[in-house]
Amino acid sequence: MAAAAVVEFQRAQSLISTDRNASIDIFHSIVRRDVQEDDEEAVRVKEQSILELGSLLAKTGQAAELGGLLKFVRPFLISISKAKAARLVRSLLDLFLDMEAATGQEVELCLECIEWAKAEKRTFLRQALEARLISLYFDTKRYQEALQLESQLLQELKKMDDKALLVEVQLLESKTYHALSNLPKARAALTSARTTANAIYCPPKLQAALDMQSGIIHAAEEKDWKTAYSYFFEAFEGYDSIDSPRAVTALKYMLLCKIMLSLPEEVQALISGKLGLRYAGRQTDALKCIAQASKNRSLADFEKALTEYTKELRDDPIINTHLAKLYDNLLEQNLIRVIEPFSRVQITHIAGLIKLSKNDVERKLSQMILDKKFHGILDQGEDVLIIFEEPPVDKTYEAALETIQNMSKVVDSLYNKAKKLT
């Protein structure tokens, strides 16, 4: 029995690269077969077949079948050790969730697995699955549910010795707070995660995720694009080493850093480099177009890129946030350059020069006047912008402050001398 299963398993493996469907059918037949608990070889072959079948179903995009496999193998999991069962469940669930197939059953399937782990009294597996559920809540923007589960799970994990899972949950906490724009708490959670990670060996995937979040926090909170770039580069190398689809996201953020550092010419060099060529596609093309628009200071090209690559740019909250600021800066620079030669100019003329709608231009000019980016007024009756000369800086206030500071020093000196005499 076991010998026949081994032969079938080897045949299925040999067909993976040439005939995936035939390989899947053979693995299916091995997985469906009942095995005796005391037949170690047959149990081992069935374990490996489950993992191989799960991997093939994920690669061929068969999300529903993979979800079904996860439910089907539960009776078999009771007959093997808790550690092996936990590894199988986590591996299959990770494969299912990493597919990002958006079947709508992800949360439901994860909750089912958690209930099964509770019923079987498998605490470590339940905690690992709850961490995966937090990640799902985060991906589906259910942030309050994520924070609630994070709080409960962190209390448990701090009393136990599973440091790797603790790092994972602390990292998820940082991501959740960042998504809620609570940067101080996001930074604190990330610091806790990195401190915990320093005491253990971090798998490449987890280390890359830590580096990615560090780059995001540096970019969001401190606008420290050089440091953010170095973190994104580390994350990119980490994800690339394990062939993770997240590598292209890290590469996108690297390109974003170059654009925000006013180095758009370096974007092409990164994309055409040895590592960049491997990930060439719409994701990198989108940032390439933004870099070109930034280099040419062209708002029209910028708008065109945002329209053409909506999914790649607008749907990524990190990219979208920073590109909105970049667009705003670019618009201000263009407006200041256009109005510089004038003391009085029609708003429609400005809109025509920078190829934007009159309402958008009028709104931005109003904001710039309020922010004191230049001195002027909008005459809406005449539909013109009137620009004033830069008023001379009144130095009376600065001179008064300097005088008061000098007088304070004199008084302090006299006080010290009088104190010595007494």
From Swiss-Prot:
Quaternary state and interactors: Component of the lid subcomplex of the 19S proteasome regulatory particle complex (also named PA700 complex). The 26S proteasome consists of a 20S proteasome core and two 19S regulatory subunits.
Top-level taxon in the UniProt lineage: Eukaryota
A molecular function GO annotation: structural molecule activity
Protein name: 26S proteasome non-ATPase regulatory subunit 11B
Coiled coil ranges: none
Domain PCI: 228-392
Family that this chain belongs to: Belongs to the proteasome subunit S9 family.
Native organism: Danio rerio
Keywords: Cytoplasm, Nucleus, Proteasome
Function comment: Component of the lid subcomplex of the 26S proteasome, a multiprotein complex involved in the ATP-dependent degradation of ubiquitinated proteins. In the complex, psmd11b is required for proteasome assembly.
InterPro entries: 26S_Proteasome/COP9_Components, PCI_dom, Rpn6_C_helix, Rpn6_N, TPR-like_helical_dom_sf, WH_DNA-bd_sf
Location of this chain's protein in the cell: Nucleus; Cytoplasm, Cytosol
GO CC, alphabetical: cytosol; nucleus; proteasome accessory complex; proteasome regulatory particle, lid subcomplex
PROSITE patterns: PCI (PS50250)
Chief location: nucleus
Annotated PANTHER family: 26S PROTEASOME NON-ATPASE REGULATORY SUBUNIT 11/COP9 SIGNALOSOME COMPLEX SUBUNIT 2
Gene Ontology biological process terms from the UniProt entry: proteasome assembly; stem cell differentiation; ubiquitin-dependent protein catabolic process
